[in-house]
C-alpha cells in the first residue's frame, strides 16, 4: 500500500437520504448473488441474531415485531413507531452501514485495504457500533461476523434505552411522537447550561428527569430530556424561548445521560449478550471517541463494547473533538504524504463540517483530499445474477396423528396392530357401496369390481362439526378426507404442543400445510347425489388444506398435491422443501384417502392394479396386486434448531427428502430401478450419509410382481451392495406396512412414515406379514449374503451408544414418481436439572363442548391412574403452555398428582357437572387493576417472583436503580427479604410498595392480561397513575419518596392512629353522637372502603376512646398498623411542599380510565389530574366505595368485570367483593403465601373467567426444565355425517352408451313381494339388520285407496289432510317390525312415540290416477332402545326422494310397568276432574254436547268421516273437557292401530281449541304441530268404550300456542296418554291458502333415486347423544302463506297445515295493511321464524341458537350468509345484507336488529 495514503471511514448516526426501502431491497437482491457471499452471510447472521433477540423480548414487545424471514421483512415497519422504535432504528442503521461497507468491497472485488496506523474509524452515536465491528476485523470476513454482534448490541441498547426512558415519561397515549432532544444554534454551551440549571432548580426537577446538554460544538448545542420538560424549559427561559432551535428526530428516549445511567446499566446490555466474538477478539483499527476525539483505549472486543456503551449512555458528544481527532490522524507526518481519503455513507451536516475543517487545515498545501461514497455501488447493475445455493438445516418431526384401518384411530392402536402382526383385510362395508350389486368376480357386469376386499377406517363419517365451526349441513357435504385432515392436523399439533404464536417458528403467518390426495370419491359420488351450497368448498381438494389454514388462521402456503400413490410422502417432501427454502417455519403435512366410489375399484381392477385374492402380499411369490385402503395421517415438521429452541419432543430428524420420475421406464406405470437408485443417491448426497449406515428401510412394497422385484433390486444395490459389503453388525432390516393395512394410495406414504417414526419410538421393528407362502423368486437371491432382509419377527432396534440410527422411507407413484425420505434419531435430550420449588402448579383442560370437556377430564384421570409418577410440573407445562385453549374450561392449582386426581374425581362425580359448566364469554371480560396502599406492606413481598422471573426482577431492579439515583434507599432487600425484620422507615415502606406494584402491573401485562382501567387506594394511587401513563414511573417514585421524606420530617410518628370500623360513616357518627362521653371526640374519616367499612383517623387517645365506645356496641374495630393517620389533618404540614413538587411533574391524559377514589368518578382526560389532585388525595377521604359505584353507574364496571389486586396483600380485592358480591377478584401476592402460587391461582381464575393468559411467559424462565408430555388426545363430540351412496347409478350409467332407455312414470307396486305391507306402509325399499342396529326404508302412495280413505276421513277446507293418527300408525307399524327383527321372541312391544314434529301438512291430490308417494326412513339402535323416524315426499314421476323431511319423530321402547305406576298415581286426579266436569254440567255451569253437536262444532275446522266420530258425548268447560268414546268395531284395513281409533280417543283436544267459547274461533282456527309423547298401555279394542280427558292451557313461551295432556281411560284405569299435544292459533283467512290440494306431485331439486337403498346405521350412542340428522323442511306442492303474510302473522301449526317456513309460491295475494292488523302480529313471531329458518338452513337445532351464540361458532360463513340473506328475502320478506352477519356477530345482536328494523 502507498505509504503516503491515509484514510478515515466515518459511520454516521443518520440514515442516508436515499429511499431506505429501496436501499435494503437492493442489498437483499445483491446478497442472493454468489459474488456477494460475505454480504449474504452478514445479512443471514444479522437476521438470526434479530430473531434471537426478539424471541427473548417480553411478550408485549415481542408481539410488536411482525414475523420476518430476513431483515428486508422489517423494512416496511415504521422504525419510529412504538416502544421498539429505538431498537429497530439502531439495529437497522447498523445493518445498513455494515451491509453497504461489505458490499462495497465485494462489488469492487478488492483486497482488504484498511491498515492499522494508516486507517482510522470514526462515528457518531449508534454509528460507533458499526465502526466497532470494522475495528475488530482483520479482513472482510471478520466484518460479517463481528457486524452481526454489533447488530445485537445496537438492538439491546435501543430496547434498554426505550424502557428506561418510558419510566421517565410515558409515551403519548394517542401515539403522537415527541422529541427527546432539541438543537439550539448561535448559543454557547455555557449559556445554555446556565439556563437549564436555572430551570431545573426553579421547578424542583428530580435529578433523573432534568433537562441537560447531550452534545455540543462551536455552533450548536443539543438539549435533551423528557419531552414535556424540554417544552417547559423553553417556555420557562426567555433566552431559550426566543433562541433558534429545532427538535431532533429522537423519539425513543435518552442517551448521553450521565445522571441517568450507571455501570450496571451498561453491563446489563453488553455483558449479557450471547457473543462468541466479544471475549477474545482484539481491536485491530483505531476508533475515535465521539466525546474526546481520541482513540478508545480498549484492547479487546469486550472492552471496546463496554467503552462504547459507556460513551453512548453517559458521554456527551463533542463534534469539535471528533473533527480534531480526524484532522490529527490526517495530519502529515512527512512531506511525502500526499493522498487523504474520507469514506462515508452519503453526506450530512456533520460530515460536511468535518470535511470543511480538514480542507481548511490543508489549505495551501499540496495535498489531495478525496471522498468515497460507500453507498454508490448498491445501485450499479452487475449483470445477470449468479444465484447462491441455500444451506439446509436438519428438520425435526415433532407431532403426528392418524386414522388407519383396523380401528387404528390413534398411534397407540396403530402400533399395537403392527406389534401383533395383524392383517386388517375385510370386505367392502355396506356404508361404502353394496357388494351385492357392485361386485362381479367375472367382470362381465359393466362398472362392477372384481374384488370385494379392502382395508377401511372405522366410522369415517364421525366428526365434531361444532368444534371446527361448521354447521351440520356443511359438515355433511364436506369430504370425510377433508374433515379428518382437520382432525388429525389438530391432534398432531396437539401432540407437538403447538400453540400458534407461542414462539417465532409457530407464528400463524409462518405455518403452512401440505397434503397429498389422489381421488375425489365423496365429491364425485356421495355428495353429487344432491349438489348443495357446500358442494364446491366441501369437495374440491384445495379446500382441504384451505380449511385447515382458515380454521387455525395459518397464513402460510397451503398445497394439495396429487402424485398418485406417493402423494402423502410427496407432500411431506414438499413441506421439507418449503422449510429448507425458508418459506415456512412450521409445516403440517400428510396424506388423505377415504374410499367410497365403486368406479375407482372398477378402474383399478380393470388396469390389473388390484389383487383379487386379498391383502398386499409384499415379496410373496403369489403377489398379484395391491389391496386398497383408507388412511389419514398428519405430521408436524420444523427446522431442528427451532424445535430444540421451542422445547419440543422430537420424534425423528429428516436429513433429506427427494422426488424424481421414472422417465426411462417401459411404461408410465412400470417402476424403474435406475430412477429409484438415482433418487436414493440424491437424498444420501444431500445429507452426506453413507448408505451402509442405514439400518432400516420402510419399503413402498405394494405386493405387485413388478413393483417388488424392482424395489428389491434398487434397495439392495444402493444400501447393501456386493462391495463394500455390510459387516455382520450392520444388518439392514426391511419392512412394508402395506402387508398389514393395505395400500392407502395417497395416504400410503404417510402411513409408512408414521410406522417408521413409531419404530424409532419403540426401538422395535415389527414383524413382516406379507409373505403368505414363500419369498418371491424375483427378489435378488443374495440378500442374506449382503446382510439385508425382511424382519420376519418383532426385532429389537436399539440405539447404539453415541450414535444415531438411520432409516429410509420409500413411496412410489403409479404415474412414475419416486419419493424417498432419510431419517435419523432425534438428538438425545439432556433435560436441564433445576430445583423445582414451585409449590403449586396450574393444570388446565378445555374443550368446545361439555361432553368433550368431561371426556378430556376422564382421559386425564385415567392417564394419571396409569402413570401416577407423572411430573406435576411437566403436566402443568403441557396442559397450559403447550395447548390451544377453548371456551369450555377446567382449571385448578394443586401441589401433587394425588390432589389433582381427587379434584378430577370430585368434578366427574358431580351429577350437576354438565349443567354447572358454562362456556367462557366470547367477549373477553374487562380487567381492572386495584392498587393497594401501604397497609399491606411486609418484608419479602413478591420475593419468589423476584427470584423466579427475570422480567419481573429486571423491572424491580430498573425502578430500584431509578430510586437510588434519586437519592432514595434500595428496596431490593425488602423484596428479597434480606433486610432485618424490624419496622421500616416510611420512605422504604412506601417506595417498596409502589415499586412492587408498578412491577406487578407490568408483569400482569407480560402474562397477557389487558388492562381496561385502574384504581388506587391511598398510596396505591401513585402506582395506578403511573400504570395509566398519567405520570411516569420515575415521577411516581420521586413523588412517593419525597412525600415520605416530608412526612418523616413534618409529622410526628406514633402520635396519631387509624381505626378500621365495621360500620358506615353515618352510623359511626350517630353512635358517637348519642353518647355524651363520645359526642365531642374529634376524628376524621380517612377511608370509606365499602358501604359497611370505614377507616377513621385522629390522635391516639381519641381513637382509642372511639374504639372502646364502638366495641361496647358490638361494632368490630381494628387499629391499623401504620405510623401515621393518613388522610387527616396530620398530613397538613406536607401539603404545600408536596403540591410544589408535583407541579414540576408533567401530567398526561390517561391511556386507560382512572377510577378516582378522591372524586368518586372515572377520569378519562387530564383536566382533573394535576398537582392539586395529589394534594387533595393526600389529605381528603379515600372514598373507595363511591368510586366503585361511580364506575358501575358509568358502565365501566359490570358483573363480568375482573379485578386484580396489585399489591403485597389482597386488601382491595376484599373491598371489591364487599361492594360487588358477584365480582371476580384475584390476587397478585398474599402474606404468608408463596407469591408464585398466588399468581398461579389467579391465572387459573382468569383463565376460567375467559381471559387467555400467556402461559408461555409463565413457564419461560424454566422451560428447559420441563418436558412436553404425550397426554391422551382431545376427545371429540362426534356425530355421524355420512351421505350414503344410494342405488346403482354407477352401474346404470354404463347403459347410456347403448342409448337411453325410455322412462316410465313411477308407481308403487302392490304386487311386488314385501315383508311388510299395511294400508299405510306399502313397500320396503331398503333394509339392513345388524347385531344391535337396524335400518328400514319404506315407500307408500297416498293415492292408494286405503291410504286415501284414511286421509279423507279427516278433511279441512274440503281437502283430505293426513292427520297425526296416520303418522302414529305408520310409526308403530315400522317400530314393532324392526324391533322384532332384532329381538324376534319378544311377546309385546311397548312403544312411546315421542318428539312428533310435522313441518308440512300432507294434502291429498284431487287429480285422478295420480301417484303421490312418500318415504319413511327408520333407524333403530338397540343399545339406546330408541328409533328415529323421518318422513319424506317423493317425486310422483321418478320416485326420487326429497332431500329434506316433512315430519320426524322418535320411538322409545319402554317398560309398561313404569307407565302403569306413573298413571296409577294420576288416575284419581283425572277421575276427580272428570267428576267435577260432570257436576258442573249437571249444574249448567259447563256445556254437555251430544255427538252430533260435538262434531258439528268440529266441522267448523275439521269434517270427520263417520268412522272417526267416536265421541258419544262431551262435557266442555272453557279449555277443559271430557268425552265418552266408543270405537267403531270395524278396522277398515290393515293397521297396527287404526287411525280412526287413535283420533277418536285423542281429538278431544282439537274440539276444545276449535269449539270452546274460550277461543276466538270466528277469526282463528287451531292446528297441532305435534306432541311430546303418545303411549298406549294396551292395544285399542274394537267397539270398546273409553273416556278422554284434557285441559289445555296457553304456553308462556308463545302466546299463540296452547298445550295439554290427553288422558285415555278404560274404566277407572288410565290406559293411554298423549303428552303435551300442542295447538297453534292461525288466522282463519289463511284457511284457503294452507289447505288446498297440490297442483303437482314433483319435488323440486335433484335428489338421489330411491331404489336399491342400502345403509348401515351407525351406533353413535357411546360418543354422542342419539340425534337424527336435522333436515330442513322442503317446499311442498300445496300453496303456502305469502312472504308478506309470513312476516306479519303467526305461522300455522305444521302437523295439519303447511308451515310458513315453506317457500313463497310464484303467485301470492297482496296483503293489505288492514289484513295485516287482523292477523294480530306478535313481535317475537318474526324472531321465531327467523330462528327456525336459520336452524333449517344450517342444520342446527333451534335450541342451539342462543343469544350469545356467534355465527362463526355456528358455522355461518360468507357462503351461508349469502344463502341466509336470500332465504330471508324470499321466504320472510325481510331484506338484509349478507354483511349483517358480520356486523351483528351473535344471534342476540341479529334478533335485536330485526326487532328494531323489521
From Swiss-Prot:
Molecular functions (GO terms): 3-oxoacyl-[acyl-carrier-protein] synthase activity; fatty acid synthase activity; phosphopantetheine binding
Region (C-terminal hotdog fold): 1486-1632
EC number annotated for this UniProt entry: 2.3.1.-
Compositional bias of kind Low complexity: 1698-1709
Listed pathway(s): Secondary metabolite biosynthesis
Catalytic site: 565, 700, 743, 1354, 1543
Function: Non-reducing polyketide synthase; part of the gene cluster that mediates the biosynthesis of neosartoricin B, a prenylated anthracenone that probably exhibits T-cell antiproliferative activity, suggestive of a physiological role as an immunosuppressive agent. The non-reducing polyketide synthase nscA probably synthesizes and cyclizes the decaketide backbone. The hydrolase nscB then mediates the product release through hydrolysis followed by spontaneous decarboxylation. The prenyltransferase nscD catalyzes the addition of the dimethylallyl group to the aromatic C5.
Protein name: Non-reducing polyketide synthase nscA
The encoding gene: nscA
